[in-house]
Design a protein with these regions (language model features):
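Metal-dependent phosphoester/phosphodiester hydrolase catalytic core
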Residues: 1-280
């Protein structure tokens, strides 16, 4: 029953569906969700971080075991054999809880080995800036939609005001400005909205200047059709980010694919739900 579909040509209007989610600790009773997703027949599925919980960045072989035990599940095989899968990481599959990698591409010394294991296990079109500038950011297109998948861990340094690091930030700004797609989807492993996380401790609100730099670019360059995706909090939310000098931005967050642990709903959200397990 395995099959694949060719994506609509870049720039061509087409009907298709894309799923996304995060928060996927290996949890045998909940692994059936991959079969459920496959049954919905999305054209692609975006894994937005915490795709596994390795939390042991210096143990490469153990990381591989964590990947392999998921990949050997019949339910996951059904999804990955029939659906284009794209992935970025968040703290638990990059390093440990709330980790920041820092601006040095090669320090701490576990960063590059973790990146190499990640590359072994996900079929992304490319991985950041390659050997000289490792990371998991990349972009791809389906029809008239451009997807920009960002890496908010490898170069994160809140003390220096950055989530992306200078190279990735330049890449994102140039890609957004050059895009002629009707819709531009920017995906992040952590939340964009200021009220969505624990006071900005582990979200874009922890680097408000860099966040504003990206949003101001959208306003000033009149970049239409931007949609924000995120994960991390164990619930599903929809937020509206008001932009007085441009159009309001909408953020869609979901991150409880297989996890048992749940975060409380948010009154500030347009929609917030945390019962059971889910994807969007």
């Amino acid at each position: 029953n395995n099959h694949f579909r060719t994506s609509p040509c870049k720039g061509r209007k087409a009907h298709f569906s894309v799923g996304f989610g995060g928060g996927a600790r290996y949890n045998p009773p909940k692994e059936r969700i991959w079969k459920t997703i496959a049954g919905r027949k999305p054209h692609a599925f975006l894994f937005l971080g915490d795709n596994l919980y390795q939390d042991k960045p210096t143990h490469r072989n153990l990381q591989r075991v964590y990947y392999y035990r998921r990949q050997m599940r019949e339910e996951f095989v059904e999804l990955s054999a029939t659906t284009a899968c794209y992935a970025i990481w968040d703290d638990h599959d990059f390093g440990a809880n709330d980790v920041s990698g820092g601006l040095d591409p090669f320090k701490p010394p576990w960063k590059v080995p973790v990146w190499k294991v990640f590359k072994e296990n996900w079929p992304n079109p490319y991985f950041g800036g390659g050997e000289k500038q490792p990371g998991c950011w990349f972009d791809f297109s389906i029809g008239d939609v451009d997807f920009f998948m960002t890496d908010g861990r490898y170069y994160r340094d809140f003390k220096k005001g950055t989530m992306l690091g200078p190279v990735q930030k330049k890449w994102l700004k140039e890609k957004l400005t050059a895009s002629t797609a009707t819709f531009k989807v920017i995906a992040s492993g952590t939340l964009w909205t200021e009220t969505a996380d624990k006071g900005g401790k582990d979200s874009w609100w922890g680097v408000p200047e860099e966040r504003e730099e990206i949003f101001s670019l959208i306003d000033e360059e009149k970049i239409e059709g931007v949609i924000l995706l995120s994960a991390d909090r164990h619930r599903t939310d929809v937020y509206k980010i008001k932009r007085p000098k441009g159009y309001d931005l909408y953020e869609f967050e979901t991150s409880k694919l297989t996890n048992n642990h749940t975060h409380g709903t948010k009154e500030q959200a347009l929609f917030s739900y945390n019962k059971g397990n889910f994807f969007a």
